Design a protein with these regions (language model features):
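All-alpha amphipathic helical-bundle segments outside canonical DNA-binding/catalytic cores
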Residues: 242-251
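Membrane-interface aromatic/basic loop that binds lipid-linked glycans or pyrophosphate carriers
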Residues: 266-271
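Nucleotide-sugar donor-binding/catalytic module of glycosyltransferases
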Residues: 1-236, 240
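Amphipathic alpha-helical repeat scaffolds of TPR domains
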Residues: 251-262
């Protein structure tokens, strides 16, 4: 389990506890700090002193995104399976048990669990893409279910470490929205993709705040340019597969473009 964070001492402690409290006990926790200036490293090191399953890695300089710390976590991982967690989210207590059981029994390259999107300041909860998680399913690659392209977050999935390394799959450096390209590459390379209905990940968001996570701060120019760049890289991956390009573009129009149009028309005059 690879946990990443930057200047998020209070929330990373909660995220880390959700990993330590997993009902499946035989896990490796690699906590990668992106050169924080708050007490995040001390929080992680204190926990590591109490729990030998935790390894702490501190990057020498801040990378400005999620890719570098996640890629470093993949490099350090010795477990046969890999999962990712962000410092502002948590895992369901049985997440590892449910995902590990599925990926081994299905003989899949990766398995997708359900993510619960929680709006902290309203209490609203919603399963992300519930139509994908109605039943247990195994797909023989992405073409068998192009709708998987609507679920390109990386944190609600378990991956065979050998699968990632053999296919040279890592997060793109220097770009936000890195999950989308990473997950697409996984889906394209996988011969068997599992899906389970159980909620494995609690994805916390705060509506209407200015200090949310990277994916929540939509007005910054870099967010717009990086989202365009990621989509161009995804298009390149799908160049020879027009049927999948259609599904990817449908997801862009329904989800990402609507986010920015909503933000644009919600701006006050002068912004």
């Amino acid at each position: 389990m690879i946990l990443i964070g930057y200047n998020d001492a209070e929330r990373i402690a909660i995220a880390l506890n959700s990993l330590r409290d997993q009902s499946f006990r035989d896990i490796e926790i690699i906590a990668v700090d992106d050169c924080s200036t708050d007490s995040s490293v001390e929080v992680l090191q204190s926990a590591a002193e109490l729990d030998p399953r935790i390894k702490v890695e501190v990057l020498s300089s801040n990378s400005g995104g999620c890719s570098a710390p996640r890629n470093r976590g993949i490099e350090l991982a010795t477990a046969p399976f890999i999962m990712f967690c962000d410092s502002d989210d948590t895992y369901d207590r049985h997440a590892v048990r449910n995902l590990h059981s599925a990926v081994t029994s299905m003989e899949a390259d990766l398995v997708v669990g359900a993510a619960k999107r929680i709006v902290l300041n309203t209490g609203e909860e919603k399963i992300w893409r519930p139509e994908l998680h109605a039943t247990v399913q195994v797909f023989q690659g992405l073409r068998a279910e192009p709708g998987l392209l609507f679920d390109t977050i990386s944190v609600n999935k378990i991956y065979r470490a050998e699968f990632l390394r053999e296919n040279g799959i890592e997060f793109p450096s220097g770009l936000l929205f890195e999950d989308q390209l990473f997950t697409l590459k996984c889906f394209l390379a996988a011969s068997r993709i599992g899906v389970i209905p159980e909620v494995v990940y609690n994805w916390n968001v705060e509506r209407g705040t200015e200090d949310g996570s990277i994916t929540q701060s939509r007005r910054e120019l870099r967010n717009v340019s990086d989202r365009i760049a990621i989509n161009q890289l995804m298009d390149a991956q799908l160049q020879s597969q027009p049927d999948l390009v259609h599904a990817k573009n449908q997801k862009f129009l329904e989800h990402e473009l609507s986010l920015y149009l909503t933000t644009l028309f919600g701006l006050e005059e002068g912004e």
